[in-house]
Amino acid sequence: MTWFRKPPAPATAGDLLFRAIETWQGEAPWGRVLDAGTGEHSLGWLVGRPTRAWTAVTGDPTRQQSLRTAFSTRMRPVDRVVDGDWADPGLLRGEVFDVVLADYLLGALDGFAPYFQDRLLSRLRPHVAGRLYLVGLEPYADPAPDEAGAIIVELARLRDAAILLAGDRCYREYPHTWVLRQLRQAGFQVVNTEVVPIVYSRRFIDGQLDVARRKLPRFRDPGVAAAMGQAIEALRGRAHAVHDRLGGLRVGADYVIEARPVGG
């Protein structure tokens, strides 16, 4: 089964999220780090940190191999990319890390372990010796409050329709207020939070619609696939026009949270 993960926010937003983590970490040693839901974006940032060792987990064997290849020259003998499912109690059993990063992991989890989201933070808790940094996306407001929001919601609906018609699962994002409650229930103390507004670019628009287009060959009905292809390009034109007129699509926000184990 394949899945879709939201592409990284525009560089300025992504930089701000990771910059917040770097600021909160300060002079504290990074030590052993776990990237609990890895990808090129998070791992590309992580390999630039002064870690003693890192472990990166992905639920996709294909991605595991591609990441090993992409980062082969930057991996030390102590670094590893692991294929695993957090619903598996044996995954990294007994291992503890100084820092754990969960970069958009909650949103992506539905593709690997549906209905496990409310247990994820408790599952990660035994692996966190020092700090947990969690990055997420606020769910889009629906109905949207303005024109930019309406375009983003329409993009998300069309993309998700294509994903479902291809037989795959969509991601599901959770608001930071829900995450804060779950962290406290899982035995964490929330230390810092930051919310970063998003300005979506043409690149984001095209990325979302290209995800939908790549699903078309797997539609069972060629007629539905053809109609979806036309809808994709029609929406691309309208979204580009709104983007250009507004100077970007200012919609929603990403958030980053620092938490530490209670009593840790």
Would you name each region that the model predicts?
Residues 1-30:
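Class I SAM-dependent methyltransferase Rossmann-like catalytic core
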Residues 32-92:
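Class I SAM-dependent methyltransferase SAM/SAH-binding core
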Residues 90-100:
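A short acidic, Gly/Pro-enriched loop at the edge of an enzyme's catalytic core
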Residues 131-159:
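Conserved class I S-adenosyl-L-methionine
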Residues 169-187:
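Short alpha-helix
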Residues 188-199:
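Conserved S-adenosyl-L-methionine
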Residues 197-245:
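C-terminal helical/coil "lid" or tail adjacent to the Rossmann-like core of SAM-dependent
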